[in-house]
């Protein structure tokens, strides 16, 4: 079971809402790592909003392991080819994910899921 899970409408306002939901992790996750998670959730939710369609929803799930953090963002959009992502495809979103995450990937189709993992940093809170 995820440590944090929530569902948002696939609308532009959900990008900020998703970042705000991560505030629940303050004290459990290192402050700098929480900032990285906010950036990563912004980029992945932005992609979902762009591709899922306004009538759809986005599911966000996060697991806090002893050594890693896993984030999944799922939508009902048309999917994509995870390893063929580049800046020329319309944005920096998955390029940023690739640079900041230890590992990442996705499952294309309906639903489409982007997942990523970070090495967990000790909390300083």
Show which residues each predicted segment covers.
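Short beta-to-alpha transition helix within the HATPase_c
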Residues: 1-20
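Conserved short strand/loop->alpha-helix "switch" segment adjacent to the catalytic nucleotide/phosphoryl-transfer site
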Residues: 19-42
């Amino acid at each position: 079971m995820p440590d944090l899970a929530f569902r948002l409408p696939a609308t532009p306002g959900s990008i900020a809402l998703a970042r705000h939901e991560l505030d629940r992790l303050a004290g459990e996750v290192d402050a700098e790592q929480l900032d990285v998670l906010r950036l990563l959730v912004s980029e992945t939710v932005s992609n979902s909003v762009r591709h899922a369609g306004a009538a759809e929803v986005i599911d966000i799930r996060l697991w806090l392991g002893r050594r890693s953090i896993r984030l999944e963002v799922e939508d009902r959009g048309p999917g994509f080819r995870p390893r063929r992502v580049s800046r020329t495809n319309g944005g920096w979103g998955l390029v940023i994910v690739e640079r900041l995450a230890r590992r990442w990937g996705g499952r294309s189709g309906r639903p489409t899921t982007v997942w990523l993992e970070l090495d967990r940093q000790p909390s300083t809170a």
